[in-house]
Amino acid sequence: MRSAAMFSAMLLPGAGRVQARPFSLNDPEDYAGRLCYNENPLGPSPLALQALRNEAALAHRYPNWLNTNVEEAIADHLDLNTDQVCVGAGATEIIQKVADAFIGPGDELITAFPSYVQMANEAIANGGTAVYVPCDENHIIDLQGILNAITENTKIISLVNPNNPLAKIIHKDDMAVFLDQIPEGIIVSVDEAYHEYVQTQDYESCVPYVDQGYPVVVIRTFSKVYGLAGARVGYALSSAELIQQIQDVQLYATVSRPSHAAALAGLTDSDHVTSTIAANLVNKVTLEVGFSFLGLEYIDSETNFIMVDVNTEAGPVAEGLADLGFQVRTGWDMPQHIRVSTGTADEMSDFLVALETVLETSGVQSDMVPTVPGINSVYPNPFNNKCQIRITVPTNEKVSLVLYDILGRKTYTLINKPLAPGVHDFIWEGK
């Protein structure tokens, strides 16, 4: 049981708080495509929206002080005990409180790089030291390197799985071997913010390790697949003992009544989660096809964002995209990469057009001509009134490009003649 007398707050120094921020300095209200925060473009579940509206009328009443209503629902959802769950104001608060509970002056935290840096910065702000282990050549977290970095001062190993910004997973077999080698007294924090998006069978959540006695703290959020980033609800899953230590440094009433209601409703709407995952898969393919067409290499993604090499300095490309209304992220000592979140179908198509424009302006030209003929892109996609269709012809040959309606009736012939090798654009006016 939580003791009110144990609640405390630890404030980071100003510089530490800025360094720990997960956000960019883009204008949050001025965009054509906000592709920098890995948000859910479908928005919240309709059930969550209704719950928000209903609960707004009770905004004059304090919330459940200790978030036990949401903790009970999460525990039931994941087949855990309520004392194995700690809810807070987004994963942001949870990460801070994990650091506050287990890291003090002289302690060490080990994490991967590139990765999500908040836990490391919270540790530094608490007087600890962060040790960074580079990811391997396949952009995967180097678990053996992390084991080799352990010292007598190590208190937390912080993993992000799937990783952000590299969007790669830790193989489930590698994770099992890794956890068996963790010395006593070290906690393994695993941030699973993007857990629901993963499709590969090589991945497994670390939640089952909670009941197996491993010293793991799994961190999750309602900000991503549930579409509640603005509601600020996150949670930790661990043993009752470790959860108690996290709760002992947590302030009460940090999550509002409407946010409680939205999280509870969203948790029950599996259809919305399924729709979100399906839309993400489609729109991620749109990005992958577009990047390939532009001759850009990207890192295969298991999440709702992709890291792509733009073949030039990323900063000016991001600025050029921002001028066209598209917000993306740069950094992580990857000077030629931008991180792009999946958005709506229209946002993906418009973004690819903008990216091509910026790259052409920057003097980055693609000389890649796919060896397989066919339609490379359609903007917008799906189209209705007007669109641009781009095709590739690898050799001299006759090309026939005909549009049919959904009943199979021919509506328009765009081209029916020989074309030279290369890339060709056609505009259909929708008439």
Residues covered by each model-derived region:
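N-terminal export signals
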Residues: 1-18
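C-terminal outer-membrane/trafficking sorting elements
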Residues: 367-379, 383-431
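Conserved PLP-binding catalytic core of the aspartate aminotransferase-like
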Residues: 135-137, 281, 290-324, 342
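N-terminal "arm"/small-domain region of PLP-dependent enzymes with the aminotransferase-like
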Residues: 16-61
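PLP-dependent aminotransferase class I/II
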Residues: 45, 215-299
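PLP-dependent aminotransferase-like
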Residues: 101-159
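Active-site pre-lysine segment of PLP-dependent enzymes
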Residues: 143-150, 165-188, 192-225
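Phosphate-binding glycine-rich loop
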Residues: 67-108, 122, 126
